[in-house]
């Protein structure tokens, strides 16, 4: 469930929608390639409210107005989740409930919500307009934000959330809907839902209102029609591969990548007859050769890659692959949507481990994949079968984390670039891998397709395995851990952290030397991090 597109699933009289913030954001830098439906300036939808915030006309509780306003976010969300109804027949409620409904009707009379349907592929149900995609609200074209909300930082804060607030709560934050299933008042409603005449949620594995908000937020940042959230980045990668590559198919991937992704491609996909060509990230000739010699279904790579931060020319490889009918999926975890817009560069799909920069606080596991509705729907269908659904509490943590995404990424970009330059000049550092450095083999590509170079720097210490471990142990600020992208700095020695089960010679086949260090810069003060790294280098 990515983008809520039920234009009038419930009457609008109880919505406090802000028209200036409704829907997605126009991505003016995205070519008209069918990957995102961007509205012209002449057509717009105002006041469109996300489904969880619309209250059906018979939704009442015997609460005073004051009590309703004081409901907690979670409590209100649970009440909302339990009250989906389009039944227009109203029983005889108490005077208090009637007073609340009267107040709601009066408020709506003062500020009615104007909803203009822009999607012609709709069904009319009891004077309500709802798309025919059932509860998978992916078919709505992007909506227009206010002109002053055109920066990624503002979008990361507001996208998907200021889509309308019910009068029960004036909460700024998005509620957490903790439920495993959603009920129907009567069988006729269930039949309408099954026959796609009524929009609703059904089961927790298929979608959650809190998760929808996060999917809309990520879609707005990526300029995507649809986004699907999953329980981890690896879940997103594996489900994408299983959904889009047929049995007996062929993919192209790169030498430098996350090891677990490589293991899945090398050991699991062959069981379905799927083969792979592995190329250097910069070897365009090898890609062309594979495209000409084989029926390639998909090109899948990271950019920047893990751990050497190699960069793929996304625009070029997308052009080459599309000419041969192959799809392109870019794992942009190291870049973030703020530093790189893979879809705008021509990729069909962009994937993230939201555990990293998007969540940004080292406290949640999640993955996401964004792109055109058709492709994401294919992945979604398999995901609903396999499971791996994201818990709504985890979705809330990422929503909260993304409100500071632009601040964190700006700090991490700056710290990483400055430290990369210092490390490159240090006599106890043999080599530095960072796309922001002119010495990086794909620096020219990174400059072309990235606005910032990320918060991770890899480098080789002048020493062996034990000397490098001594350097790591001498650091005071970063944690020794296997992740990156959070507020806290993290350091690891890949030869030990990720490849310790392989011999030194086998590690070397992947370029993993004993003296390699991967440093993820957090948001600590630059001078503190600089002093810590320099003292650790002085200790070896």
Curated annotation (Swiss-Prot):
Pyridoxal 5'-phosphate binds at residues 203, 205, 233-234, 258, 353, 355. Its EC number is 2.5.1.160. GO terms for biological process: methionine biosynthetic process; transsulfuration. Binds 1 pyridoxal 5'-phosphate per subunit. Its main location: plastid. The modification N6-(pyridoxal phosphate)lysine is found at residue 356. The keyword 4Fe-4S does not apply. CDD domains: CGS_like. This is Cystathionine gamma-synthase 1, chloroplastic. It comes from Nicotiana tabacum.
């Amino acid at each position: 469930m990515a983008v809520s597109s039920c234009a009038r699933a419930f009457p609008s009289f109880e919505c406090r929608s802000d028209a200036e913030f409704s829907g997605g954001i126009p991505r003016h830098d995205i070519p008209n390639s069918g990957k995102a439906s961007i509205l012209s300036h002449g057509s717009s939808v105002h006041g469109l409210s996300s489904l969880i915030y619309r209250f059906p006309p018979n939704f009442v509780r015997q609460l005073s107005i004051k009590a309703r306003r004081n409901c907690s976010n979670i409590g209100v969300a649970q009440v909302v989740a339990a009250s989906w109804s389009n039944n227009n027949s109203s029983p005889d409620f108490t005077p208090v409930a009637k007073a609340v409904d009267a107040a709601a009707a009066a408020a709506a009379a003062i500020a009615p919500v104007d909803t203009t349907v822009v999607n012609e592929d709709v069904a009319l149900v009891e004077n309500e307009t709802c798309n025919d995609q059932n509860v998978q609200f992916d078919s709505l074209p992007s909506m227009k934000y206010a002109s002053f909300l055109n920066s990624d930082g503002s979008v990361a804060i507001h996208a998907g959330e200021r889509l309308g607030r019910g009068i029960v709560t004036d909460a700024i934050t998005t509620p957490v809907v903790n439920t495993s299933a959603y009920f129907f008042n009567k069988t006729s409603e269930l039949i309408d839902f099954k026959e796609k005449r009524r929009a609703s949620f059904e089961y927790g594995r298929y979608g959650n209102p809190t998760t929808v908000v996060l999917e809309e937020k990520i879609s707005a940042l990526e300029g995507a029609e649809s986004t699907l959230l999953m329980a981890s980045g690896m879940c997103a990668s594996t489900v994408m591969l299983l959904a889009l590559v047929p049995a007996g198919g062929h993919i192209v991937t790169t030498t430098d990548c996350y090891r677990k992704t490589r293991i899945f491609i090398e050991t699991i996909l062959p069981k379905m007859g799927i083969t792979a060509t592995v190329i250097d990230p910069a070897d365009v000739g090898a890609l062309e050769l594979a495209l000409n010699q084989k029926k390639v279904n998909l090109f899948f790579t990271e950019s920047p890659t893990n751990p050497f931060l190699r960069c793929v020319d996304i625009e070029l490889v997308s052009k080459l692959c599309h000419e041969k009918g192959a799809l392109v999926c870019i794992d942009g975890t190291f870049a973030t949507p703020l530093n790189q817009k893979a879809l705008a560069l021509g990729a069909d799909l962009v994937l993230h481990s939201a555990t990293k920069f998007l969540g940004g606080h080292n406290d949640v596991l999640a993955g996401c994949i964004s792109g055109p509705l058709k492709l994401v729907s294919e992945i979604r269908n398999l995901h609903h079968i396999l499971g791996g659904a994201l818990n709504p509490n985890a979705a809330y943590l990422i929503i909260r984390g993304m409100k500071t995404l632009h601040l964190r990424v700006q700090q991490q970009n700056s710290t990483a670039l400055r430290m990369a330059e210092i490390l490159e000049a240090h006599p106890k550092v043999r080599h530095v891998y960072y796309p922001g450095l002119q010495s990086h083999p794909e620096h020219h590509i990174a400059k072309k397709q990235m606005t910032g170079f990320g918060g991770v720097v890899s480098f080789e210490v002048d020493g062996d395995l034990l000397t490098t471990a001594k350097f790591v142990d001498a650091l005071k600020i970063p944690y020794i851990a296997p992740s990156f992208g959070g507020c806290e700095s993290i350091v690891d020695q890949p030869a030990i952290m990720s490849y310790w089960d392989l011999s030194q010679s086998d590690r070397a086949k992947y370029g993993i030397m004993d003296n390699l260090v991967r440093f993820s810069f957090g948001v600590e003060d630059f001078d503190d991090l600089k002093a810590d790294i320099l003292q650790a280098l002085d200790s070896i």
